[in-house]
Swiss-Prot record:
<dbReference type="GO" id="GO:0010628">
    <property type="term" value="P:positive regulation of gene expression"/>
</dbReference>
<dbReference type="GO" id="GO:0060055">
    <property type="term" value="P:angiogenesis involved in wound healing"/>
</dbReference>
<dbReference type="Pfam" id="PF02198">
    <property type="entry name" value="SAM_PNT"/>
</dbReference>
<feature type="modified residue" description="Phosphoserine">
    <location>
        <position position="267"/>
    </location>
</feature>
<feature type="modified residue" description="Phosphoserine">
    <location>
        <position position="270"/>
    </location>
</feature>
<keyword id="KW-0963">Cytoplasm</keyword>
<dbReference type="Pfam" id="PF19525">
    <property type="entry name" value="Ets1_N_flank"/>
</dbReference>
<keyword id="KW-0805">Transcription regulation</keyword>
<feature type="cross-link" description="Glycyl lysine isopeptide (Lys-Gly) (interchain with G-Cter in SUMO2); alternate">
    <location>
        <position position="15"/>
    </location>
</feature>
<dbReference type="GO" id="GO:0045765">
    <property type="term" value="P:regulation of angiogenesis"/>
</dbReference>
<feature type="cross-link" description="Glycyl lysine isopeptide (Lys-Gly) (interchain with G-Cter in SUMO2)">
    <location>
        <position position="138"/>
    </location>
</feature>
<dbReference type="GO" id="GO:0021854">
    <property type="term" value="P:hypothalamus development"/>
</dbReference>
<comment type="function">
    <text>Transcription factor. Directly controls the expression of cytokine and chemokine genes in a wide variety of different cellular contexts. May control the differentiation, survival and proliferation of lymphoid cells. May also regulate angiogenesis through regulation of expression of genes controlling endothelial cell migration and invasion.</text>
</comment>
<dbReference type="InterPro" id="IPR016311">
    <property type="entry name" value="Transform_prot_C-ets"/>
</dbReference>
<dbReference type="GO" id="GO:0001222">
    <property type="term" value="F:transcription corepressor binding"/>
</dbReference>
<comment type="subunit">
    <text>Binds DNA as a homodimer; homodimerization is required for transcription activation. Interacts with MAF and MAFB. Interacts with PAX5; the interaction alters DNA-binding properties. Interacts with DAXX. Interacts with UBE2I. Interacts with SP100; the interaction is direct and modulates ETS1 transcriptional activity.</text>
</comment>
<dbReference type="GO" id="GO:0000981">
    <property type="term" value="F:DNA-binding transcription factor activity, RNA polymerase II-specific"/>
</dbReference>
Length: 441
């Protein structure tokens, strides 16, 4: 980027051009065109970037991308990233990490967002995303009608290689009675990610109930629109994966970079966003921080329980519910703390430090330090301890995922609808793991 700058208090950017990240120097390099980022030049760079970002407005209008990024579909996010890559000549961007809708993207938080892209590249993208959010305007419309979303000219070759086809609009089903919907059910089950805002605006979410979480052909979800606003097919455009129907994600960043209480979505047989992060791993990948292996060529069918039952290599040394497999099954992306706890709880070799009490979904951390150590190892956080882990657990309280059992030390209970998600009753899992009721009971 080249800019003629008046260094007087009335700072003015006269001209901005396309930015090539390779032009940005390291502290030991000399560059006459672009100054080093110092506290005094930070605002200057921010203004220059903002001026360059203005070029995205034409792209928004051309593709019908809403101005509020929280209302973006996965296709809109994809178009935005591709625009930025071309506009700034960005290097090393892993497009798979951005396969989510705008609500999920905005809900990540800065720290988690920056993990999606290389150094400085993430800062560029985050700066633009923040600017777009602060504008806080309604989605772009033409004559009061929601626009169609033509395919970006940047996307055809790359995303076809990942099996992603043109967006398919799925019409809303008939409204159903919402009175039996709980927040935890809503949190752990498939939802239409296109209409959701970030978790900061959770009170504005529509209530959702799943007609059949195991539909093998089409996505069928009932919507309850708030403020008498009925969702239209345009609001529910979702990418379709030709190599398998995959799950979606909205996420929530907590203290110590916990990937806590991400909104979980469809099983393999469901259709939504977050396409290329859906995985069916081998057991060899369960102790890896990396994403598990890619989907097989065939389309997996059935429930998570069916998947586990069909595993020929399942034995007493392997967890019944491996966290990586559950993350892939739900499409939640990186392994979440609650998924990791389920892995430990369904691994007989871990019963010395964490186990079910025998009372439903209640469990006890017999050695909380060992649980924290293993979580830190899994997330590559060597300073992890129980104090930090418990802070992560507390983020689940308000979400009705996990609650602390009153009067019992290190005892917690899953209060969400795990049975519908996993296909197991707690009694079935207890029998498989030879769990005996806690003597304290």
């Amino acid at each position: 980027m080249k800019a003629a700058v008046d260094l007087k208090p009335t700072l003015t950017i006269i001209k901005t051009e396309k930015v090539d990240l390779e032009l940005f120097p390291s502290p030991d390099m000399e560059c006459a065109d672009v100054p080093l980022l110092t506290p005094s030049s930070k605002e200057m760079m921010s203004q220059a970037l903002k001026a360059t970002f203005s070029g995205f407005t034409k792209e928004q209008q051309r593709l019908g991308i809403p101005k509020d990024p929280r209302q973006w579909t996965e296709t809109h996010v994809r178009d935005w990233v591709m625009w930025a890559v071309n506009e700034f000549s960005l290097k090393g961007v892993d497009f798979q990490k951005f396969c989510m809708n705008g609500a999920a993207l905005c809900a990540l938080g800065k720290e988690c967002f920056l993990e999606l892209a290389p150094d400085f590249v993430g800062d560029i993208l985050w700066e633009h995303l923040e600017i777009l959010q602060k504008e806080d305007v309604k989605p772009y419309q033409v004559n009061g009608v929601n626009p169609t979303y033509p395919e970006s000219r940047y996307t055809s070759d790359y995303f076809i290689s990942y099996g992603i086809e043109h967006a398919q609009c799925v019409p809303p089903s008939e409204f159903s009675e919402p009175s039996f919907i709980t927040e935890s059910y809503q949190t752990l089950h498939p939802i239409s990610s296109e209409e959701l805002l970030s978790l900061k605006y959770e009170n504005d979410y529509p209530s959702v109930i799943l007609r059949d979480p195991l539909q093998t052909d089409t996505l069928q979800t009932d919507y309850f629109a708030i403020k008498q606003e009925v969702l239209t097919p345009d609001n529910m455009c979702m990418g379709r994966a030709s190599r398998g129907k995959l799950g979606g994600q909205d996420s929530f960043e907590s203290i110590e970079s916990y990937d806590s209480c991400d909104r979980l979505t469809q099983s393999w047989s469901s259709q939504s966003s977050f396409n290329s992060l859906q995985r069916v791993p081998s057991y060899d990948s369960f102790d890896s921080e990396d994403y598990p292996a890619a989907l097989p060529n065939h389309k997996p069918k059935g429930t998570f329980k069916d998947y586990v039952r069909d595993r020929a290599d399942l034995n007493k040394d392997k967890p019944v519910i491996p966290a990586a497999a559950l993350a892939g099954y739900t499409g939640s992306g990186p392994i979440q703390l609650w998924q990791f706890l389920l892995e430990l709880l369904t691994d007989k070799s871990c019963q010395s430090f964490i186990s079910w009490t025998g009372d439903g979904w209640e469990f006890k951390l017999s050695d909380p330090d060992e649980v924290a150590r293993r979580w830190g190892k899994r997330k590559n956080k060597p300073k992890m301890n129980y104090e930090k882990l418990s802070r992560g657990l507390r983020y689940y309280y308000d979400k009705n995922i996990i609650h602390k059992t009153a009067g019992k030390r290190y005892v917690y209970r899953f209060v969400c609808d795990l049975q519908s998600l996993l296909g197991y009753t707690p009694e079935e899992l207890h029998a498989m793991l030879d769990v005996k009721p806690d003597a304290d009971e």
